């Protein structure tokens, strides 16, 4: 059983992992190079706790299971599970995994929070790569239950299954990707939506607010309970997906999308930055994060009542 977790890097994603693991009574050792980041991390833990408490029915925050260190060796040498959260950079991750592999226990699982890099390459210089994989979460990690588990070419199924059990023990819903591919699953879908949005803005058809509303008030409401395929299955009526493909399949030949990304010019960047600034209406990122977190807590609590009827 995995009891002690090491989180390497305390940025947005690393902080989320620390909070989720502490919430589920795991001993957590957080690593970062600057000791000053410890204070920042604790401040964020305390900000988030009211939302975590409400979602997971926890009484009070216990920091006795939390330790902050500035040595990778100290962070990983006694850990059962290591969750790496360094920037999306092959050279940096390869170097880091080499160090982690040297100091980690032989059977300690090493998972990268990478959102699109290939695990085989990330762990190319890591000792015992059979216990390595991707464990890609969604932001905010402390609330969102999804995590994509992506194996490398040398990953052993024993460790994949062990990682799956661990993520379930901290109230996550593991998505097992059959083999490695750039961007994994969710980010490839999000990237397609993002690129299409950039084209629409670049060509002057809509603002960032218009596009966000098109998702928020349309498919986004459904997607929190049912994904694209089940949603389209329902669109086919009584005959389901069979009729849907027959009815709407020809639309695949229509020029409805441009998946190749447009050039990110200064003009396009300005439109996007200006648009999102206007959408924020003067609210800080922290303030908007609080609103989002409160919404997600209530949404997830409500979803539990219905998802069991679909996913039995």
Predicted regions and their residues:
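NAD(P)-dependent Rossmann-like dehydrogenase/reductase catalytic/cofactor-binding core
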Residues: 2, 24, 172, 176-178, ...
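Rossmann-like NAD(P)-binding element
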Residues: 33, 51-109, 117
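NAD(P)+-binding Rossmann beta1-loop-alpha1 motif at the extreme N-terminus of oxidoreductases
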Residues: 1-55
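Active-site-proximal catalytic alpha-helix in oxidoreductases
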Residues: 16, 141-150, 170, 175, ...
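Rossmann-fold dinucleotide-binding core
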Residues: 112-179, 183, 187
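Hydrophobic/aromatic residues located in beta-strands of well-ordered beta-sheets
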Residues: 28, 82, 110-111, 132
């Amino acid at each position: 059983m995995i009891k002690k977790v090491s989180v390497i890097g305390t940025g947005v994603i690393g902080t989320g992992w620390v909070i989720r693991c502490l919430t589920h009574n795991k001993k957590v050792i957080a690593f970062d190079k600057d000791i000053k980041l410890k204070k920042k991390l604790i401040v964020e833990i305390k900000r988030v706790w009211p939302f975590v408490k409400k979602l997971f029915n926890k009484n009070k925050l216990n920091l006795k299971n939390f330790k902050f260190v500035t040595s990778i060796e100290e962070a990983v040498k006694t850990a059962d599970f290591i969750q790496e959260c360094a920037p999306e950079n092959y050279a940096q991750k390869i170097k880091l995994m080499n160090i982690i592999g040297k100091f980690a226990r032989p059977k300690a699982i090493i998972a990268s929070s990478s959102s699109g890099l290939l695990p085989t390459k990330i762990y190319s210089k890591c000792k015992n790569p059979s216990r390595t994989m991707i464990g890609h979460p969604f932001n905010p990690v402390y609330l969102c239950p999804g995590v994509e588990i992506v194996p490398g070419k040398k990953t052993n199924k024993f460790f994949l299954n062990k990682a799956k059990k661990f993520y379930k023990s901290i109230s996550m819903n593991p998505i097992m990707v059959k083999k490695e591919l750039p961007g994994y699953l969710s980010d490839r879908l999000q990237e397609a939506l993002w690129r299409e949005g950039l084209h629409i803005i670049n060509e002057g058809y809509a603002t960032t607010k218009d596009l966000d509303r098109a998702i928020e008030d349309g498919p986004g409401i459904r997607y929190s309970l049912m994904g694209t395929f089940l949603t389209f299955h329902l669109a086919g009526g009584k005959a389901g997906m069979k009729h849907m493909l027959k009815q709407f399949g020809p639309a695949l030949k229509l020029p409805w999308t441009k998946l190749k990304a447009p050039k990110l010019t200064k003009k396009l960047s300005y439109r996007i930055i200006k648009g999102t600034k206007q959408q924020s209406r003067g609210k800080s990122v922290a303030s908007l994060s609080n609103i989002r977190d409160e919404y997600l807590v209530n949404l997830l609590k409500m979803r539990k009542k219905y998802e069991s009827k679909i996913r039995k």
